[in-house]
């Protein structure tokens, strides 16, 4: 590796001190960089692996400038920072990711319109600004469809499935609280995602196609490589996206595959993503390694080698309650506990990756463990 752009000992600032920030910091440190993190939570996971911690809200202009003055480059671990605040920071400090992607992707309507104009295949959608617009959604999309808030929402929050007329009132309640987008509900055969890193010189590195399973709108499991031949098609869609949206660093595009085997772009995460965590053990570079290489101006690997097929399981609070006593009996479970102070049933507390020669058998073993049947 050649680190002739940002020298050893330089400081990387991270806005956001959750598990993604923590894993970014760990990659940065093994490459010889120092890390400063800003987060409002006194006990955020990244604090305990950073060289310097600034406790402040994400819209605290003074604290953000303090971070900028201390750091040679700034990155962010999530997309809920104010795009306008980020734009102002970009004018003064080195933030390779920029603010444009955040500005587009914070608004689901703008995201979908941008994806559509880029020529990607997206699920049919319509803007619903007020409750009377729901009639137009029924006429345009037909049942079933999903109503989602334009702003905010993650892990399934801020959305309502409308199966029939009986569900309309729940959708109207959501529309009355905020502007929304309605989109056609697909009969989904499989969910996949593609994690990508783009460097300053427009170099692009692709990770293997990831096959995902969600439960209650939270990622439950990722299998790599995906058990469906869609990698070329997914790359083609990503290549269209990066012509329209500025990305530097690691990002992930999530896709639906419907019952007719059609691939649709669902949404984009403009930073490292939960479905890419397997790469820490299963690939020669992790998604965090390539992210740090990109934002520090280094060359990216030409390709990512999958060292071994893998099954990655999210660990929610309820999973820790179920499995905590078994961890020491399974050294093949590569365990990552994020260090969050409060355990909650549906909160992401960690993840684990199992390298395997038989993903189907390992998948069944994990189902048995996580569903408490073995």
UniProtKB/Swiss-Prot annotation:
Entry-linked InterPro entries: ATP-grasp, ATP-grasp_carboxylate-amine, ATP_grasp_subdomain_1, PreATP-grasp_dom_sf, PurK, PurK_C, PurT/PurK_preATP-grasp, Rudment_hybrid_motif
Membrane-spanning residues: none
GO biological process, one term: 'de novo' IMP biosynthetic process
Enzyme class label: ligase
Gene3D superfamilies: 3.40.50.20, ATP-grasp fold, A domain (3.30.1490.20), ATP-grasp fold, B domain (3.30.470.20)
KW Nucleotide-binding (keyword) present: yes
Recorded catalytic activity of this chain's protein: 5-amino-1-(5-phospho-beta-D-ribosyl)imidazole + hydrogencarbonate + ATP = 5-carboxyamino-1-(5-phospho-D-ribosyl)imidazole + ADP + phosphate + 2 H(+)
Entry keyword set: ATP-binding, Ligase, Nucleotide-binding, Purine biosynthesis
Protein EC: 6.3.4.18
Residues that coordinate or bind ATP: 108, 148, 153-159, 183-186, 191, 214, 266-267
Pathway in which this enzyme or protein is active: Purine metabolism; IMP biosynthesis via de novo pathway; 5-amino-1-(5-phospho-D-ribosyl)imidazole-4-carboxylate from 5-amino-1-(5-phospho-D-ribosyl)imidazole (N5-CAIR route): step 1/2
A family per Pfam: RS_preATP-grasp-like
Family: Belongs to the PurK/PurT family.
Assembly and binders: Homodimer.
Record PANTHER family: PHOSPHORIBOSYLAMINOIMIDAZOLE CARBOXYLASE (PTHR11609:SF5), PURINE BIOSYNTHESIS PROTEIN 6/7, PUR6/7 (PTHR11609)
Function noted in UniProt: Catalyzes the ATP-dependent conversion of 5-aminoimidazole ribonucleotide (AIR) and HCO(3)(-) to N5-carboxyaminoimidazole ribonucleotide (N5-CAIR).
HAMAP family cross-referenced by the UniProt entry: PurK (MF_01928)
Protein name from the UniProt record: N5-carboxyaminoimidazole ribonucleotide synthase
